Amino acid sequence: MWVFKFLLLPMVSFALSPEEMLDTQWELWKKTHQKQYNSKVDEISRRLIWEKNLKQISAHNLEASLGVHTYELAMNHLGDMTSEEVVQKMTGLRIPPSRSYSNDTLYTPEWEGRVPDSIDYRKKGYVTPVKNQGQCGSCWAFSSAGALEGQLKKKTGKLLALSPQNLVDCVTENYGCGGGYMTTAFQYVQQNGGIDSEDAYPYVGQDESCMYNATAKAAKCRGYREIPVGNEKALKRAVARVGPISVSIDASLASFQFYSRGVYYDENCDRDNVNHAVLVVGYGTQKGSKHWIIKNSWGESWGNKGYALLARNKNNACGITNMASFPKM
């Protein structure tokens, strides 16, 4: 009995001091991500959200270690935000009410011949560094710019960062930081006669007046093609034959917010309710799990240095084929 009580003492002491331990972690997290708050009340409310997220991350990773999940989570710079806030402030897919498919824009895959079992356009030099859209609903602009960058590299052999801010400010049929759609951005570049480089038109993360400068034009566009909805085989063909592809996904879950590594598959990810645009830069298989390689626009602190592996051939996981498209150059 005395031995039992003795063994319990460290556990009791530990249970009474979680706040002190979390204080240290909280201060370290704030310093790492340069977090500052307007008031003590604001900091306390953010701290409580952070603690809740931290507990969910720990619980998930325990399950992952037991083989329940194919991916792990990690605390990141979004730790003091709820998943609802992330969707509201850091996504931005806004689908036009009049959106419809046309035979003129539908991508018809060439089914003859094999395509590689895996491909990674990062290794081929088609992909610029990961960016951070900040609290501006401009995911559509980053996805569009990324797809244009891939086609520019394919056509000219040169990799050059293009300007999401040019799209945010100048695509009048979209809503800037209020959201937008990728094919609308491709149409703008086509009708405008070009898009500026990132160096000429840097990102500021808020709506500004259109400052497009034709003399700084870095790429053109001849139109776009849309991948058949729900067809992952067609998307694979497009990635292999065309290059990086703009896609939309559901990014509303905490499991996506704190994704760290592994193949992301959450059965609660809603394929019928996409809200965020990303860029598919490849595909492959990891430990028997087929995946897409996606480039996000939440900075390198998110995911695996800004990237994620998303389940492939798992019933259109997260709606990845719902609104896939690419520009023609």
Swiss-Prot record:
Disruption phenotype: Enlarged thyroid follicles, reduced extension of the thyroid epithelium, and slight increase in the levels of Tg/thyroglobulin in the thyroid follicles. Loss of localization of CTSB/cathepsin B and L to the apical membrane of thyroid epithelial cells. Serum levels of thyroid hormone thyroxine (T4) are normal. However, reduction in T4 levels is more severe in CTSK and CTSL double knockout mice compared to CTSL double knockout mice. SUPFAM superfamilies: Cysteine proteinases. Its EC number is 3.4.22.38. Glycans are attached at N103, N213. It catalyses: Broad proteolytic activity. With small-molecule substrates and inhibitors, the major determinant of specificity is P2, which is preferably Leu, Met > Phe, and not Arg. The keyword Glycoprotein applies. It is a peripheral membrane protein. SMART domains: Inhibitor_I29, Pept_C1. This is Cathepsin K. One of its GO terms (biological process) is proteolysis involved in protein catabolic process. Thiol protease involved in osteoclastic bone resorption. Displays potent endoprotease activity against fibrinogen at acid pH. May play an important role in extracellular matrix degradation. Involved in the release of thyroid hormone thyroxine (T4) by limited proteolysis of TG/thyroglobulin in the thyroid follicle lumen. It is an enzyme of class 3 (hydrolase). Disulfide bonds join C136-C177, C170-C210, C269-C318. Residues 16-114 form a propeptide. InterPro entries: Papain-like_cys_pep_sf, Pept_cys_AS, Pept_his_AS, Peptidase_C1A, Peptidase_C1A_C, Peptidase_C1A_papain-like, Prot_inhib_I29. GO terms for cellular component: apical plasma membrane; external side of plasma membrane; extracellular space; lysosome; nucleoplasm. The lineage of its organism: Eukaryota, Metazoa, Chordata, Craniata, Vertebrata. GO terms for molecular function: collagen binding; cysteine-type endopeptidase activity; cysteine-type peptidase activity; fibronectin binding; proteoglycan binding. Residues 1-15 form the signal peptide. The active site is at C139, H276, N296. Belongs to the peptidase C1 family. It comes from Mus musculus. The keyword Nucleotide-binding does not apply. Gene3D superfamilies: Cysteine proteinases.
